[in-house]
Amino acid sequence: MNRIYRLIFILCAFCGIAQAQPERPKLVVGIVIDQMRWDYLYRYYARYGEGGFKRMLGEGFSVENCQIPYIPSVTAIGHSCVWTGSVPSIHGIAGNAFVKDGKIVNCVGDNTVKPVGSDGKAGYMSPRNLWVTTIGDELRLATNNRSKVVGVALKDRAAILPAGHHANGAYWFDDKAGRFITSTFYMDKLPEWVNKFNKRKLAEKYLSQKWETLYPIDTYQQSTADANNYENGIVDGEKAQLPLDLAALYKKHGYKIIRNTPFGCNLTFDIAKAAIEGENLGKNTDTDLLTISCSSTDYIGHQVGVNAVETEDCYLRLDQALADFFAYLDKTIGKGNYLTFLTADHGAVNNAAFLQDQRIPAGIWNGKSMVKELNQELKAKFNTDKDLVMTIMNYQVFFNTATIEEAGLDYAAVKQVVVNRLKKEKIVHYAFDMEKTSTE
């Protein structure tokens, strides 16, 4: 009898646990902030409002010690890892661009598809190079396609790779057309809600104003003075010093300038809201998924660095945009009915010249120069006039294998010469032949 009572107690206990499980969210929103360093959460914390980053820190859970087991950490790889839970050797995305079948390819480039919503080259994109499924793919499969999955971003790869193969749609910004587009991989024509959104011409509205600091510029104490020698310009050839006349820059550079302003993030959240309404996300019996990537933080970071006034101002404005978006979700989906997470695809380091001026050891790796040096050494060593090294990408050396084979050279010997040469470089920590990793 005691055994029976114990069994009943255990079964009842498990029943209680099952009944206590919370309901599944109606909508999951995953937000990736391109190039956001972890310390930005706290570096600008005192200036954030209560509804954005602070709300996430206060109401959510923060992973304070997250490490990545792969190299390099760039946009395409980072987004793929976040949304597939795998690494480059498994998901197949080895960089923003990489060598495939002896040719350098765009991570999402696909000439077998055609643009939808544009006639430009920006639409020849798909997730075909992604070898595995995303969270959204698995969600669609698990619910027999009842769940909806949509991805939005300015960058094509930041919309496509998170959304995956089986998404209802992925939409990215075409600089030439000034609107969000997709490809025939997903559909043959844009949904009406996307057409309506594009007709609003929000990019033009954002670019009709000036980009001024959100607060008095002398209060930006976390940044280097705005006029400095560590920046490339807001776009190459255009000085990065606020305020910026965006209307003049738009007239000169076209729609692409939106990427290099904080308002690119606002535009991204605008289409995210349109997607929620247009696809009725969060209104179904099964959980839906929306992937969002804020790309402007990366463009700005590359142009002016991590210590710039423009970068600080971008994150202060992003905080406001997040607060507005969360308030929108509270109203449309209902507080407690959605689950959101925020992460980054990769971080960034200070400008090397800036670090050197602070007496901190730093330098820059010149891959193109190294390719020339390696080819010169190989030509002399193997008595050939052909370039044996194709390129250096993503910390990897790629060879012209057909040329090596035609010349009758020992491929292993060629690689060893390169390994030995790279080991002499002070900036190179370790060099090895990938085919020998199990023995070295």
For each predicted feature, which ranges?
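Second-shell loop/turn segments in exported
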Residues: 37-43, 68, 121-127, 255-262, ...
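Stable alpha-helical elements in mature extracytoplasmic
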Residues: 32, 37, 49-53, 78-79, ...
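Bacterial Sec-dependent N-terminal signal peptides
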Residues: 1-24
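Beta-strand elements within well-structured catalytic alpha/beta cores of enzymes
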Residues: 26-37, 56, 82, 139, ...
